[in-house]
Amino acid sequence: DYDEEMIEKFDKLIEGENYPWKVKEIMPKVLVAGESAGTLTEEGAKLLDPSGNLEAGIPLCPPEGDAGTGMAATNSVAVRTGNVSAGTSVFAMVVLEEDLKAVHEELDMVTTPSGDTVAMVHCNNCTSDLNAWVGLFREFAENFGINVDMNELFGKLYNKALEGDKDCGGLLAYNYFSGEPVTGANEGRPLFVRKPDAHFNLANFMRTHLYAALATLKIGLDILLKEEKVKVDRIYGHGGLFKTKGVGQGILAAAMDAPVAVMETAGEGGPWGMALLASYMLQKADGESLEQYLSEKVFGGESGSVMEPDPADVAGFDAYIKAYKAALATEKEAARTMPL
């Protein structure tokens, strides 16, 4: 149910307004995974399907947004597990053992479908800038009359990044197509910058843009993992960044200093996760938790392909982030001096 302490604090804050209600009276009822949310009515069926083919009486489970369905789709509903969805935007969710010690504006608090507390880091930008650079390389190849398969091009360039310096050799990139609240950037301007003596080569160029795709996420996660000392046994990755086997997965493992698993089913996404939650409501055994149902009946013990963090990669990403933070003013100044 709702946090009673927060409910009481809110009601106390509005005491002088003389509203004819208490906040809990106007909030919807809380339902957790496995509970019944009712059945589809005749009126509802007609609204959804005026043709009349959709029948009333269909059982409904509690609805979830992208966060809850993503947790179900990646089997990351247990304490000390989490998932990272990396595509146009990127977010990470970690299921907590206990409440955080402090309030952090970089972190959002949500719950699993079963009601366990989850810390979330959400960033507006991830692969858009990276994709734009890959598109530029395709244009270069086409200028020589070479038709390049995009999947092959992504694979070649991503794997080339693995040959780069662990700290990207003096290159930095900010992938901000839009602002990033985590770093206090109100607007975004994609930016690539390097030192005059940087090791400027293709491997470092690709590595810095892969780092940039996860850099803001890492800043938020460092608060969670290093300041709050939250423990994570395993993270499940899903989304476009992980399509090239072992590359995005390894870089995320370095960013978090934690094992990262990628399952073949991870690409199924939210709709499949919602279907799993509906299936749990209908098929769960007495006393069977969502965690048990997913692990035993859906995923069957399958943990996916797991990559452990490489200590050298972890140290390299940490060094990159130190330089990234120090130069953040250049990104903010670019937004100020290049109005849209």
Set out the residue ranges of the language-model regions.
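Active-site core segments that coordinate phosphate-bearing ligands/cofactors
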Residues: D1-K24, V32-Y236, L241-L340
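N-terminal beta-strand-loop-alpha-helix module at the start
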Residues: K29
